[in-house]
Swiss-Prot record:
Name assigned to this protein: SsrA-binding protein
Keywords: Cytoplasm, RNA-binding
Native source species: Bacillus cereus (strain AH187)
Subcellular location, principal: cytoplasm
Pfam families: SmpB
Highest classification ranks of the organism: Bacteria, Bacillati, Bacillota, Bacilli, Bacillales
InterPro entries: SmpB (IPR023620), SsrA-bd_prot (IPR000037), SsrA-bd_prot_CS (IPR020081)
Protein role: Required for rescue of stalled ribosomes mediated by trans-translation. Binds to transfer-messenger RNA (tmRNA), required for stable association of tmRNA with ribosomes. tmRNA and SmpB together mimic tRNA shape, replacing the anticodon stem-loop with SmpB. tmRNA is encoded by the ssrA gene; the 2 termini fold to resemble tRNA(Ala) and it encodes a 'tag peptide', a short internal open reading frame. During trans-translation Ala-aminoacylated tmRNA acts like a tRNA, entering the A-site of stalled ribosomes, displacing the stalled mRNA.
GO cellular component, one term: cytosol
Amino acid sequence: MPKGSGKVIAQNKKAFHDYFIEETYEAGLVLQGTEIKSIRAGRVNLKDAFARVHNGEVWVHNMHISTYEQGNRFNHDPLRTRKLLLHKKEIDKLAGAAKETGYALVPLKIYLKNGFAKMALGLAKGKKQYDKRHDLKEKEAKREIARAFRDRQKM
C-alpha cells in the first residue's frame, strides 16, 4: 500500500491463502451515498469478491456492503457490481494479464485515504493444494522456532 494510506476497513485474508499476489494496485471506488456510510462503519465483506475487466473498465463483483441502518428507500443493493477507478495504462495491463490462464484480479483490502474509499487490488495467480500445504508447514515451523526462542529467553 502506498505511503500516507489511511485506516484499513476490511481485509481479504483468504486471498493470501488461496493466491500468490504478484502485483498490487490502488483503485478508487464508485459508491452511492449510503455505501460510503456503511464502509465507514466497517460493514463490508471482501471474502468472495473478485474483479473483472469489461469494455475497458474494471468492475468488482460479490463485494458485500451492508445496508445502512438510517438509509430509507434510498438504500443500496448490498451485492451490486461496483466500478473501480484506475488509470487507462493500468487497466490495459490488468486486462492483458487477466486473460492469461491462472491469473485473477482479487480485492485485498479496503481503506480510507484522505476521506476517499480506496481498494487494494491484487493481480494474483492461484495456488495449488500442495502450495497451500507447503505454506502451512513453513508457517508452523516459524511458530515453533519463535516459541523455542521465547522459552529459551525466559530461562
